[in-house]
């Protein structure tokens, strides 16, 4: 996502206006809490029931008044503006907290890029910062980003829109720590072919674990929370009867397993969006591109339309290298323009069926897929990246994110086309 931020060097009247705005926000919070809760002092409000799209009733988390007030004052430290259109890059925690950050900042400042998607919780389940020791996820913390506040202050100064990436259900760390929240193969936590484990989307405690991390990212000052791996493991439909796992509140025998998976994934997104509303952040979800081509992906539980109804931004991962023969294209990696063009047409049709469609901001490819083998891939560079951007723009999609797992991005690209 890309963003333009206001100058952080406030002087004179601008400084005074900021102070006034902060007090207005605090006053509004106090009045709102007085109207809508029974909170007194540091007491917590009773849990409120929230009915999810699937009909499940779920309790929203308690909120403490002092924490809530502090949260909003804290958010007002930074002033970010949503950009004309988000044009962003993926940034690992190692890059964000190391020397690579300066190189990536230079790339953004010298081009029309304007956003960074920064790992806060990576796909191993590790946090890229050190939370307070009292947090339930504290032991997942690392020192990759030693001073998140310093990072965000620098991004504010440079007008780089900050997005926190939170990987949800792919979490080897939590699966091993809490096997009862995962999938068991006999007595062991199940692993995929790459040795990675997932936690169980049916388990409400897993939802809360991740939502609390997202809330902390919002409190840090990130303007958007991007949830990734919001799904069951790939191919789960082939092993759902072999593995041992809780189905939580999704045990209704009248509903088939595919629909239970879809309901659990969609319910998590809806719940997370609701929980994050008081923080004033946008919520986005990464989703497999092929999910938009199906009524729903049977194994992983992703329904493109249902998820899109509960987010501000939908980010389909449409890397040409990740498609088999599709849209009449035998070898999609060799034809990035055509693949992205055809996908964008289909996605526009799907989103056009929704009453309130989210912003479309696809992930596009800035890497070379050598693993596809000779004759099935091409070297990706300036032309291939621009072809994908041009295809999106021709279909009215002006936002995009670039993926390169090592954060080595192509130079000389015209990102505005």
Name what the model sees in each region.
Residues 102-125, 219-224, 313, 392-398:
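Catalytic domains of carbohydrate-active enzymes, especially glycoside hydrolases
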